[in-house]
């Protein structure tokens, strides 16, 4: 029977009480390695360190679930926002569990506690007159018949020198500048791709200018006392320098905390206002006595971890909200901010699926302690850092395997050797350790490393803390080598006993110091020492255990029997690195599509095994039997490879000025300029669905005039049996514009222009159709791109023309 969970921890008078939070990961996707090191993992390391020191600490985190991004993702996946949240909350929980993240509470913001706490804070702000009503202009989509929240709009960033083409309505991903949707150049609705219009709507605003004196006093005092990281101070000062402006706290959405105000009952709170309150509400779901953590600033220290794009929300917005209530809140003392972790040649991107994601890391079979170590040695504390597979390989093989793992394995393996060659797994006695010169020199170095470790960790300089611990391992290896213990065993047994007992103590010390960074590694080392995690060294000030580091030979008693040594790390080979680099190239969507395309191509190949993969195989055989050599050559020439079918992007579509049934499209097919194409699709596909979408385009038909406008290609579409329903043949969303559509088993270059006399198109099109799985096919062979196969929406066994 499982033991009941421990009771919630509460602040204890007279002890150091620390509340650790990580920026709440947004729930609309799988976290990538940049997200993980930026907040969740960094906070976990610090919380574990606090436990190591004996501080009374809780670590609070959870998924941020309200807002536009959730609604958008729900639309993409054709489900409700709650279903999206349930799905991705479980995904996040599983990823963090695999990474050995130890939360005291991992909650979510779509909870009753969130509504209760958020609305209570709002009421206090209303009572204290820090909120004002105002009319603002917001983008409204006539096609979707809704106001567009920030993340439902994309356009060109207006910031000089940036001009990023896919800036979101709330923030530019490229330059990190916070935006209003109306500031975007050429904005588009993310749902239908149409251009929205500006329309008035009433909202509530937090009067940041009126709170500025209180806020500036808080920032000036706390940034010094709390040793804020320099990047946090710079980002905050940049905001203050621009001048604080009233900030809207409501949005025209359905998915969120309802505003408890009659006039605004159909609106919800804006996610920037709502999300940081999630730290409080998740604590409230951890313990009903949450106020003992959040309303006792004299007795609780709040440490917050996040990426640099989250800084203003935590140093300006959230503190202003709490200050405005007039209540005595536990305000942030220390903020630890990371820059960006970039991936190989570009940026990690959750929205674009680029990089290695949490589930990807698990699939590599590289253990979580290796991922934790690599991310933490590469933690972007003062500037952007770069993830590369070669660097991961170097750090694993050199630092973990050859340094740390080698030291521990050499020590324990020698102790485990049978008597006459070692100590038969029994730790020897070493009464004269203090007078052994080489050991005294090692202890002096170790003490300095421990002091540096503690100093760095207290200042939340995690990378330096890890470096200090690893320095002990390097010195331990040098100590072993210089001692020549393998000779001492025969020549000076007493000295050898000192070296080995001291080394076993250093192994134990390393297991304890590295626990915050690599907990599963530490547990394994303790297991090989035949010790439990409960026997781990505590660096509590009141227990005097820091001083014990000066006598490492005393850590493990003489006569203690160790466990069975085994290698702690496995070499990462060049061919594995190359395999991972190829496997994780491109975006997640492209990788998924490629895997699907490979699987479908294999399926087709298996089906056609034993047959000749050329057009008209049976006809060809029949012609051969009848001796018609001329006809045979003609058949060989009529192959689907003659068709130049490409992935096209409709840049613009409009009604033909002189024909009610025709559209005129401008389609990008990867050439210098878009092609003009005329299509008879008006009766079947609404105009708004023809905008900014990818299609399959036959590009080598002879241009033909249609009601006065020359068409230079043909959009491929499937129709049902009675031609009452027509659907476009759609390539995968991540397929490259201009990429040629291919057919497994049919190779060759397309004709520049199809020969009308030979009726090539007429012959080949007779075998173009959608199959029972809605895949577009030539005979039984799918239309294939590098990103996957092309499909139709719902028409099975339809003709494609």
From Swiss-Prot:
PROSITE patterns listed in its UniProt record: AA_TRNA_LIGASE_I (PS00178), TRBD (PS50886)
EC number: 6.1.1.10
This protein's UniProt keywords: Aminoacyl-tRNA synthetase, ATP-binding, Cytoplasm, Ligase, Nucleotide-binding, Protein biosynthesis, RNA-binding, tRNA-binding
Subcellular localization(s) per the UniProt record: Cytoplasm
Pfam family, one: tRNA_bind
Record's GO cellular component terms: aminoacyl-tRNA synthetase multienzyme complex; cytosol
Gene3D superfamilies: HUPs (3.40.50.620), Isoleucyl-tRNA Synthetase, Domain 1 (1.10.730.10), Methionyl-tRNA synthetase, Zn-domain (2.20.28.20), Nucleic acid-binding proteins (2.40.50.140)
Motif 'HIGH' region, residue range(s) on this chain: 25-35
Protein name (database record): Probable methionine--tRNA ligase
Species this chain originates from: Oryza sativa subsp. japonica
């Amino acid at each position: 029977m499982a033991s009941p969970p421990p009771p919630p921890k509460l602040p204890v008078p007279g002890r150091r009480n620390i509340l650790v939070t990580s920026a709440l990961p947004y729930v609309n996707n799988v976290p990538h390695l940049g997200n993980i090191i930026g907040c969740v993992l960094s906070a976990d390391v610090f919380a574990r360190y606090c436990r190591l020191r004996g501080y009374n600490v809780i670590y609070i985190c959870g998924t941020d679930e309200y807002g536009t991004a959730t609604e958008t993702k729900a639309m993409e996946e054709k489900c409700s926002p709650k279903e999206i949240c349930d799905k991705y909350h479980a995904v996040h929980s599983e990823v963090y569990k695999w990474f050995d993240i130890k939360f005291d509470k991992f909650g979510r913001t779509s909870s009753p506690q969130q509504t209760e706490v958020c609305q209570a804070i709002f009421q206090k702000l209303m009572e204290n007159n820090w909120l004002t009503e105002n009319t603002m202009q917001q983008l409204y989509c006539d096609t979707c018949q809704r106001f567009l929240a920030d993340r439902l709009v994309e356009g060109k960033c207006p910031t000089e020198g940036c001009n990023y083409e896919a800036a979101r309505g709330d923030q530019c991903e490229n330059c990190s500048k916070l935006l209003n949707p109306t500031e975007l150049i050429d904005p588009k609705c993310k749902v239908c791709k149409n251009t929205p219009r500006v329309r008035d709507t009433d909202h509530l605003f937090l009067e940041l200018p009126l709170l500025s004196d209180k806020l500036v006093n808080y920032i000036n005092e706390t940034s010094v006392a709390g040793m804020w990281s320099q990047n946090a101070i710079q980002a905050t000062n940049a905001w203050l320098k621009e001048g604080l402006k009233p900030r809207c706290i409501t949005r025209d959405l359905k998915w969120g905390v309802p505003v408890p105000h009659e006039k605004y009952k159909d609106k919800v709170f804006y996610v920037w206002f709502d999300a940081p309150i999630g730290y409080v509400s998740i604590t409230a779901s951890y313990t009903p006595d949450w106020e003992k953590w959040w309303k006792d600033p004299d007795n609780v220290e709040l440490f917050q971890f996040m990426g640099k794009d989250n800084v203003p929300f935590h140093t300006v917005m959230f503190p202003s909200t709490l200050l405005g209530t007039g209540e005595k809140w536990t305000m942030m003392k220390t903020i630890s901010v990371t820059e960006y972790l970039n991936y190989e040649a570009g940026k990690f991107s959750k929205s674009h699926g680029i990089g290695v994601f949490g589930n990807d890391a698990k699939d590599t079979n590289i253990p979580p302690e290796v991922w934790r170590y690599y991310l933490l040695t590469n933690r972007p504390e003062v500037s952007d850092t770069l993830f590369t597979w070669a660097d991961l390989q170097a750090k694993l093989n050199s630092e973990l395997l050859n340094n740390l793992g080698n030291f521990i394995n050499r020590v324990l393996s020698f102790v485990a050797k049978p008597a006459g060659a070692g100590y038969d797994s029994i730790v020897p006695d070493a009464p004269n350790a203090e007078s052994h010169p080489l050991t005294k020199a090692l202890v002096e170095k170790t003490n300095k490393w421990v002091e540096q470790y503690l100093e760095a960790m207290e200042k939340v300089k995690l990378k330096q803390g890890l470096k200090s611990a690893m320095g002990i391992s390097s010195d331990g290896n040098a100590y072993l080598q210089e001692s020549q213990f393998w000779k001492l065993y025969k020549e000076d047994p007493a000295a050898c006993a000192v070296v080995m007992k001291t080394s076993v103590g250093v192994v134990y010390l390393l297991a304890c110091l590295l626990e915050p960074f690599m907990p599963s590694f530490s547990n394994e080392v303790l297991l090989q020492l035949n010790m439990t995690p409960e026997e781990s060294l505590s660096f509590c000030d009141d227990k005097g255990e820091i001083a014990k580091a000066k006598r490492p030979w005393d850590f493990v008693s003489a006569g203690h029997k160790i466990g069975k040594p085994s290698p702690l790390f496995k070499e990462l080979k060049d061919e594995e690195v190359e395999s991972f680099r190829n496997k994780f190239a491109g975006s997640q969507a492209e990788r998924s599509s490629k895997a699907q395309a490979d699987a479908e191509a294999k399926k087709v190949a298996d089906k056609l095994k034993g047959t000749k993969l050329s057009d008209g195989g049976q006809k060809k055989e029949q012609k051969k039997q009848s001796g018609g050599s001329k006809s045979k050559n003609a058949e060989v020439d009529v192959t689907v490879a003659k068709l130049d079918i490409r992935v096209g992007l409709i840049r613009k579509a409009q009604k033909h000025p002189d024909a009610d049934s025709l559209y005129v499209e401008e389609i990008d097919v990867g050439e210098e300029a878009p092609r003009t194409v005329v299509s008879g699709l008006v009766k079947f596909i609404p105009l708004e669905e023809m905008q900014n979408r990818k299609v399959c385009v036959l590009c080598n038909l002879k241009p033909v005039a249609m009601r006065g406008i020359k068409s230079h290609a043909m959009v491929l579409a499937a129709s049902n049996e009675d031609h009452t329903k027509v659907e476009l043949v759609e390539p995968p969303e991540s397929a490259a514009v201009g990429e040629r559509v291919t057919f497994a088993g049919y190779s060759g270059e397309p004709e520049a222009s199809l020969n009308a006399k030979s009726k090539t198109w007429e012959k080949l099109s007779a075998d173009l159709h959608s199959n029972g799985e809605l895949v577009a096919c030539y005979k039984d062979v799918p239309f294939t791109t590098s990103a996957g196969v092309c499909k139709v929406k719902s028409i099975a066994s339809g003709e494609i023309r």
